A protein has these predicted regions:
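N-terminal lobe of the biotin/lipoate ligase/transferase fold
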Residues: 1-129, 134-135, 185-186, 214-219
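Active-site donor-binding loop signature of nucleotide-sugar glycosyltransferases
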Residues: 11, 140, 180
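A short secondary-structure junction signal
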Residues: 50, 100, 140, 163-165
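Short, conserved beta-strand/beta-arch hydrophobic-aromatic motifs that form part
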Residues: 53-57, 135-156
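A structural signal for short, well-ordered beta-strand segments
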Residues: 88-90, 126, 138-140, 151-155, ...
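C-terminal accessory segment of soluble enzyme catalytic cores
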Residues: 160-219
Length: 219
């Protein structure tokens, strides 16, 4: 089994976390262990390569709330990131991959919500849904056979901001979070440990090195 490095960024703004992700990508390209970065972001809207300015359906609300809109190089459309949502960046060499990367991540998200007795469904696009409402999102980029970007899983986050976008290019896409589905107060730290366990099992890793980096509340 391969070793998996874990980097927990706590809460970090999107740009700063992206810098860490790209630094880790360079390290993995040079031979470092595959790495899973976990983070929460302050409110931000990101638009992937499949999205455009038309992904924003209520720009006045976004401006009023002071929410940054950032175009990224990942796949997919527009997605909201905010506190109470677990974001993960698996930085992995595809040449060593035992299974399809996107499918493995989607299946891991399903494994995680199943721990809380929540049954999820898959759709035509990467992600998971619960009773027709999207709860897990996946958007990746591959550079020199190394993956970047990754997934987001709604845990206890405010869902109002999703109404201002076409989530993943789908008009009027309903969304939900794990707290709404379980009526439980879910610890983010506990959720991270569950995800690490399920991810490691899916991809045949041994979590080996845990690195905690100090986050920032900057937008």
């Amino acid at each position: 089994m391969k070793k998996l490095r874990i980097i927990d960024l706590d809460t970090m703004d999107y740009h700063a976390a992206g810098e860490v992700m790209r630094e880790v990508r360079d390290e993995v390209e040079q031979g470092a262990n595959d790495t899973l970065i976990l983070v929460e972001h302050n409110p931000v809207i990101t638009i992937g390569s499949d999205g455009s300015e038309f992904s924003i359906v209520d720009s006045s609300y976004i401006k009023k709330q002071g929410i940054p809109v950032i175009h990224t190089d990942r796949g997919g459309g527009a997605v909201v990131h905010n506190n109470g949502q677990l974001v993960g960046y698996p930085v992995m060499r595809l040449s060593d991959m035992p299974l399809d990367l996107l499918k493995g991540i989607v299946d891991t998200l399903a494994d995680v919500v199943a721990v809380f007795d929540v049954k999820s469904e898959k759709g035509a696009e990467p992600g998971i849904w619960v009773s027709g409402s999207k709860i897990g999102f996946v958007g990746m980029k591959i550079h020199n056979r190394v993956s970047t970007h990754g997934f987001a899983l709604n845990i206890s986050n405010d869902l109002d901001l999703f109404r201002a976008i076409e989530t993943c290019g789908v008009k009027n896409e309903r969304v939900t979070n794990l707290t709404l589905q379980t009526r439980q107060l879910i610890s983010m730290d506990n959720l991270k440990q569950i995800f690490i366990s399920k991810f490691s099992r899916r991809f045949n890793y041994i979590p080996d090195q845990f690195i905690m980096k100090e986050g920032t509340d900057a937008v």
